[in-house]
């Protein structure tokens, strides 16, 4: 009887994975870089509670010519890594519609949902490690930090409502809410640009190209091209 229940459970799980393979694949790919971040964390329960969790420090080369290397805390390195992956996944999400326009292949809602969950997870961890490294009050001392927090809060709303129940409950309002994903992209670029913590220009270029592809002129041009090819 137990073996029968176990086999039935495995069958249900396998069928779910087959049905939602796009969601599962996106989540796995998205969370793989977290392994590197988790490796920075050291657990030691032999001493007092204050030392149970610690993170190694790293020596980072200067970003500009002539700039001396500097020592970065493990939490600081985690802030950098999670922040970079957060903005990468934000750009990936915003690139899905342009990809659909160019190829005629529309990513499923579940792939978009998984990408959104991944982006929000990295953004949440980015803020968490920042609080560990600098303290949460530091968030309100610079405009770049405030803009980043605003982007993370909007992403939280999008992540919470990224399901079929919310779509049915909110109806037309759901699409309006999820258009704020574009604002998240803009805020994320501003966040990085104002703080000068990374190379934000490639992300800006990709986003601008994506917005141009979404334009009515470009959509009509693509549609006309496909019609001519089919005739």
What is the meaning of each model-derived region?
Residues 2-231:
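Membrane-embedded alpha-helical bundles that constitute the cytochrome b-like, heme-associated redox core
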